[in-house]
């Protein structure tokens, strides 16, 4: 059976929370971890994903999340839901000389499709008069 053609892209929300290792790390270590975090997500782009937007909840929270589990978010367009395991695997992989990112961040994803009618209604350019 051939895959179903979809007139819309898959979307993925990434929810992240800081772990103790991040909160307690000296700035030099945080800089290394942040560079590794960016590199991991650059790998997502190489797999066909596109970053749409990000949000850091630092206005309402300092340190690790307590009432909520998450304090930073990103929204991605992804080629297929089946890719999510491959996207998250670098965060939990143990390798010599590679920073294990799940020590510093907890990550969860939500995958779905856009609400096309809402996007068409609100993102369409205004009609000229």
Q: What kind of region is each of these model predictions?
A:
Residues 91-102:
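A common structural junction motif
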Residues 103-111:
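A short, structured active-site edge motif that brings together acidic residues
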Residues 1-70, 78-84, 110-129:
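Short S/T/G/P-rich N-terminal loop/turn motif that feeds into the first structured element of a domain
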Residues 74:
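Conserved, mostly hydrophobic/aromatic
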């Amino acid at each position: 059976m051939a895959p179903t053609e979809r007139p819309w892209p898959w979307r993925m929300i990434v929810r992240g929370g800081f772990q103790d290792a991040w909160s307690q790390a000296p700035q030099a270590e945080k800089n290394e971890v942040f560079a590794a975090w960016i590199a991991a997500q650059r790998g997502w782009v190489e797999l066909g994903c596109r970053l749409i937007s990000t949000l850091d909840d630092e206005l309402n929270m300092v340190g690790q999340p307590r009432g909520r589990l998450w304090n930073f978010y990103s929204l991605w367009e992804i080629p297929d839901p089946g890719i999510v395991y491959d996207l998250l695997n670098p965060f939990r992989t143990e390798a010599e000389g590679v920073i294990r990112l799940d020590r510093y961040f907890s990550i969860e994803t939500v995958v779905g499709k856009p609400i096309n009618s809402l996007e068409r209604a609100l993102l369409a350019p205004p009609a000229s008069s």
